Amino acid sequence: MANITAKQVKELRETTGAGVMDAKKALVEAEGDMQRAIEIIHEKGEAKAAKKANRIAAEGLTGVYVDGNVAAIVEVNAETDFVAQNEQFKTLVNETAETIAKGKPANNEEALALTMPSGESLEEAYVNATATIGEKISFRRFAVLEKTDDQHFGAYQHNGGHIGVLTVVEGGDEALAKHIAMHIAAMSPKVLSYKELDPAFVREELAQLNHKIDQDNESRAMVNKPALPHLKYGSKAQLTDEVIAQAEEDIKAELKAEGKPEKIWDKIIPGKMARFMLDNTKVDQENTLLAQLYVMDDSKTVEQYLESVNASVVSFVRFEVGEGIEKKQEDFAAEVAAQMKN
């Protein structure tokens, strides 16, 4: 058997990131051949990664990297939040975002083939990370945004990277772009404007809002409060010219019935129409950026605030770690038992 030195073990560990015992075993198996030992480490790493492939990785971090007029945002998952706070994991996330920004891949398949700063492919980096960290580490998704010289990136990460936002703003400055990114992190809009909402989605959301009104009305009835009416519309997309014209006619009829003189109608109608628009765009307010009240100035919507500073949002991406992933629920005893088996 070859005589394995501490220097060889150290060199192999620095090259592969393997643990002390794994490095020593690989060198023994390779009879001191460093190149063969590296191959053994990688082979065993792939085997470990394969065993963990079916595990659910729903924790992790987002990463953002800005390089001139190109920026990338990524989500990288681990099985536990503890590992997500590991420095090796954080480095992997940051290097992934950098690699994506510089490579500008079209999809995950192209992304996995890109070369990381370490010289290995992104896919190899994740196989090796799974082996050395001891949990399933997976590259989930990414987005690449580009801007012109006159536009600004707004990048923001909340809760240590649990939520990541990247936005492109026309006009204003970098501070405004970051504030918009912070708003997006807090209010989680799905799209920029009502024009991007699917009609079926609007109908479903409107039905949910009316279901909530029904529940509220049950409580109101118990204390003899009048029932709230159902919402007929939920989005600007549903408010056609005919609908708006009819709403104005209804307001005029209401004012006439109340005996309000026609000479003051022009002062009353705009406010009532604004209220009509507010009451009938609830789906927009919950799901579209421009219709939301701006967190930095809640007297205005985001759209109104941007207009006041002569700016506009070109695009945005918001990633929240684990969203859409069904997490496995285990009690503490089961978790400990599972760890003892591994």
UniProtKB/Swiss-Prot annotation:
It comes from the Bacteria. HAMAP family: EF_Ts. Keywords: Cytoplasm, Elongation factor, Protein biosynthesis. Its main location: cytoplasm. It is found in: Cytoplasm. GO terms for cellular component: cytoplasm. CDD domains: UBA_EF-Ts. This is Elongation factor Ts. GO terms for molecular function: translation elongation factor activity. Associates with the EF-Tu.GDP complex and induces the exchange of GDP to GTP. It remains bound to the aminoacyl-tRNA.EF-Tu.GTP complex up to the GTP hydrolysis stage on the ribosome. Transmembrane segments: none annotated. The keyword Chloroplast does not apply.
